[in-house]
């Protein structure tokens, strides 16, 4: 039939424990995103944020006070990252998108990074956090634990039918023709 094969970028996601010396305890792959977000514990009031220190290629960038921090692929730019007000990135593009979720700070913008960038997200303080990959919990996180995201060597291969039309997809998905 009339079909195409699209290759989509994926993320390699490593969870590194504070006491583990940088050795990954969990390795996963994400088509959409990896998220470090706050996790409520018994007896804890809601509404608190998690503090996440970010490194880019091993260099300190900033720390976020937010409900979470999303590292997304272009495919994931229309998933959770979109809900957090991140930009829509053409899914055939290669980039890593870093989007804060409900940040409590002046710098609240998404970064669109080169796919060769290593993004490190370290839980700061004692606030409980969790790492999810494509919506599935992969690890509870404590202070000093890190999640490291890089472009995966492997790609996702998706079969598509008919011509590729990003404009038409966006118009239909988000009701833009009604304007």
Question: Where are the model-predicted features located?
Answer:
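Catalytic core of DAGKc-family lipid kinases
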Residues: 1-67
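Broad hydrophobic/π-residue packing in well-ordered secondary structure
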Residues: 3-5, 28, 64, 80, ...
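A generic structural signal for short beta-strands and their flanking turns/coil linkers
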Residues: 7-11, 30-32, 48-52, 67-69, ...
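ATP/nucleoside-binding phosphotransfer catalytic cores, i.e., glycine-rich phosphate-binding loops
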Residues: 18, 23, 36, 41, ...
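N-terminal start-of-chain detector that recognizes signal peptides
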Residues: 23-26, 43-44, 68-71, 90-96, ...
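Short low-complexity stretches enriched in small and charged residues
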Residues: 23-26, 52-54, 73-79, 103-107, ...
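Residue-level signal for pocket-adjacent positions within structured domains
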Residues: 29, 56, 77, 83-84, ...
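Gly/Ser/Thr-rich active-site loops/lids in small-molecule metabolic enzymes
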Residues: 59-107
């Amino acid at each position: 039939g009339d079909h195409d094969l699209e290759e989509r970028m994926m993320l390699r996601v490593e969870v590194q424990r504070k006491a583990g010396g940088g050795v990954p305890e969990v390795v996963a792959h994400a088509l959409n995103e990896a998220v470090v977000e706050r996790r409520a514990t018994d007896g804890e009031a809601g509404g608190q944020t998690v503090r996440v220190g970010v490194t880019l290629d091993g260099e300190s960038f900033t720390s976020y006070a937010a409900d979470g921090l999303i590292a997304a692929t272009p495919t994931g730019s229309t998933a959770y990252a979109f809900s957090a007000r991140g930009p829509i990135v053409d899914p055939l593009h290669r980039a890593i998108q870093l989007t804060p979720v409900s940040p409590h700070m002046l710098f609240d913008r998404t970064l669109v990074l080169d796919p060769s960038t290593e993004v490190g997200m370290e839980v700061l303080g004692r606030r409980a956090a969790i790492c999810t990959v494509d919506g599935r919990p992969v690890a509870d996180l404590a202070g000093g634990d890190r999640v490291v995201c890089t472009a995966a060597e492997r790609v996702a291969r998706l079969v598509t039918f008919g011509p590729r039309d990003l404009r038409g997809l966006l118009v239909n998905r988000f009701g833009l023709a009604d304007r």
